[in-house]
């Protein structure tokens, strides 16, 4: 991953960042990237629900316009189903991102730990659900021979150790 970052740092043209899943974390990331006011960043928002993504992207665009920082190109790719490796592969093949950020949740609107007991996180429930999406993303990236850097924010304290234990390359 360090080598990939060094190569990316030396890149002189557009850096493509794909955000998979535009929930609250994805929206914060999108807003942050827009606030960087960098025209060399292209953001690709990928997910299932086009109408929701358009609405969320427009909110961020309006905020960036008000701040005077809307120099980033943002495109929306719908039909990217993270439970379907071929769907992810197609999305990656068409867009060729340099960085892929998985901010997805299997169930929309459920916050981390919302189905938990007092002092015990319900990892038994979330682990297999969370692992499926990032596992599929990593499989699609491998099959595309992509050199993209992958960042996973979806239950990362559970999913990243699992990925490492199965031999997936470091993110």
Residue ranges of predicted features:
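Conserved NAD(P)H cofactor-binding loop of Rossmann-fold oxidoreductase domains
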Residues: 103-108
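N-terminal Rossmann-fold NAD(P) dinucleotide-binding loop
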Residues: 26-29
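Glycine-rich Rossmann-fold phosphate-binding loop(s) that bind the pyrophosphate
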Residues: 22-23
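Conserved Rossmann-fold cofactor-binding substructure of NAD(P)-dependent oxidoreductases
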Residues: 79-95
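Rossmann-like dinucleotide-binding core of oxidoreductases
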Residues: 138, 142, 146-171
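A short, basic/flexible loop-to-alpha-helix module at the beginning of a structural domain
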Residues: 1-15
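Glycine-rich phosphate-binding loop and adjoining beta1-alpha1-beta2 segment
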Residues: 35, 43-71
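NAD(P)-cofactor binding segment of oxidoreductase domains
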Residues: 93, 118-144
